[in-house]
Amino acid sequence: MSRPVRNRKVVDYSQFQESDDADEDYGRDSGPPAKKIRSSPREAKNKRRSGKNSQEDSEDSEEKDVKTKKDDSHSAEDSEDEKDDHKSVRQQRQAASKAASKQREMLLEDVGSEEEPEEDDEAPFQEKDSGSDEDFLMEDDDDSDYGSSKKKNKKMVKKSKPERKEKKMPKPRLKATVTPSPVKGKGKVGRPTASKTSKEKTPSPKEEDEEAESPPEKKTSASPPLEKSGDEGSEDEAASGED
């Protein structure tokens, strides 16, 4: 089959009679068409996030402002409470000090009222007892003498104590010298001769001098005197008969 033939129209550009200036004006008037910039999905997400963040930031800032306002109000209230507490403490202290001072004054007044009648009672008692001032002074002197007499008595007692101690000390006793008496042996004894008796009677001059120089000593006989035996008695009788 044969293709159908298309109608072709011949265009005469001369009919338009356009000049080059028209092309220039056309170029000036109509610029290139502006292309729309497609935004990428990342940028869109970032924008959304930034928007959310901005909203959150604004909310946080608002919350912070509210908190700061609350804190300021609390601090103001706390300061006022502290001031009130200080005032109340001061008032309590002042009230306590005033009460203590009042109690002291009351006690002093009570003590003064008690002492006044006692003084009034003591005054007539002193007037009755005490005579003149001279007697009162004499009584004081007596008191001073009494104190001095006490001191003297104490001194005398102290002096008498060592004397008692001296009395208690025992005195040294003299040693008793005992001369044992010669005991003659028993047996037959004859008559003593005259020479023996003369020797016994006449002491030697040396013995006399010694007795004169030496003082007589106290002789305490511890043992009782010995009884003369029969032989000694016979000897004495014989000596007396010879004389």
Swiss-Prot record:
Residues 35-51, 149-174 have a biased composition (Basic residues). Residues 1-243 are annotated as: Disordered. It is found in: Nucleus; Chromosome. Residues 91-100 have a biased composition (Low complexity). One of its GO terms (cellular component) is cytoplasm. Residues 64-77, 197-206 have a biased composition (Basic and acidic residues). The modification Phosphothreonine is found at T179, T202. The modification Phosphoserine is found at residues 14, 19, 54, 58, 61, 73, 75, 79, 113, 130, 132, 144, 181, 204, 214, 223, 229, 234, 240. The modification Phosphotyrosine is found at Y13, Y26. One of its GO terms (molecular function) is transcription coactivator activity. Phosphorylated in an ATM-dependent manner in response to DNA damage. Phosphorylated by CDK1 and casein kinase. It comes from the Eukaryota. Keywords: Chromosome, DNA damage, DNA repair, Nucleus, Phosphoprotein. Residues 111-124, 132-145, 232-243 have a biased composition (Acidic residues). GO terms for biological process: cellular response to X-ray; chromatin organization; double-strand break repair via homologous recombination; glucose homeostasis; interstrand cross-link repair; intracellular glucose homeostasis; positive regulation of insulin receptor signaling pathway; positive regulation of transcription by RNA polymerase II. Chromatin-associated protein involved in DNA repair by promoting homologous recombination (HR). Binds double-stranded DNA (dsDNA) and secondary DNA structures, such as D-loop structures, but with less affinity than RAD51AP1. Does not interact with RAD51. This is Nuclear ubiquitous casein and cyclin-dependent kinase substrate 1. It comes from Rattus norvegicus (Rat). The lineage of its organism: Eukaryota, Metazoa, Chordata, Craniata, Vertebrata. The gene is Nucks1.
